[in-house]
Amino acid sequence: MLPAGSLTDKQLHFFDANGYLVLGSFSSAEEVKAMRDRMAVLIDGFDGAGDVFSTKDHRQVKNDFFFKSAENISFFFEEKAFGDDGCLKQAKELSINKVGHALHELDPVFKKFSFGENVSSLFSSLRYKRPAVIQSMYIFKQPGIGGEVVPHQDNTFLYTNPPSCTGLWLALEDATKTNGCLWAIPGSHKNGLKRRMIRDENDTHFDHPSPTYDLKEFVPLEVKSGDLVVIHGDLVHQSFENLSLVSRHALSLHVIDTEGCEWSKQNWLQRKIPPQPLYEN
């Protein structure tokens, strides 16, 4: 019997062919509740000093608040959270876009999941030698104002040489076409990385324009709470605005191999301390 989280040959074949894989009931209802309850506590203690996050406008990636979030638990507001008067239009807990990017290191509840046997076994199946979580995000996709995430590849932002980023997207609520589930182009990871975000002394830029994608090629990845979506670093994926009346909470981890793969000094995310590996061969 395979260890918990391990992938079968059939699952590995599907992932290799399509660039994504949905694992049903990866986390228990108790694990999901623990993470959601913990985030509610973190938000309750949040003093409101954050920044706005948008994938359409990357100006926020140029500021110090964003850069420092690499090793902090930082709060980012939705673009549409504020009125013309500069005040929140809804309660604080309904105004946050995401919390990142070091929950997996600094919070015991999220660290327990991130360093758990299921996650480690999954990356052992993918033949990672020394995997490490490089960033973590709790994403809210708030009702009515949950922002669009434009088509992208994770390796654009989290590049190693050779490329090694794999994303884990854990649904903490049911994700449907109505409330902003993930969409992906099956097999698009085979076309290679199209562009990179480059960080210099105090700025960021893309080395190539954003490609144009045919929306008809995307398929919805509707999942239940507790399901996990595994995402190849070159897979083209996106999510639309959440215009519904229900949120779509999710936890996102991005994992790289730290053995035989060099973290780019041009990535926006630069750490003072190397990330702790999930395991070492």
UniProtKB/Swiss-Prot annotation:
The GO molecular function terms of this record are:
L-ascorbic acid binding; metal ion binding; phytanoyl-CoA dioxygenase activity
Q: Which class of enzymes does this protein belong to?
A: oxidoreductase
User: Is the keyword Secreted assigned to this protein?
Assistant: no
Q: What is its EC number?
A: 1.14.11.18
> For this chain's UniProt record, which GO biological process terms are given?
fatty acid metabolic process
Q: Which cofactor does it need?
A: Fe cation; L-ascorbate
Known role: Converts phytanoyl-CoA to 2-hydroxyphytanoyl-CoA.
Q: What is this protein called?
A: Phytanoyl-CoA dioxygenase 2
Source organism per entry reads Oryza sativa subsp. japonica (Rice)
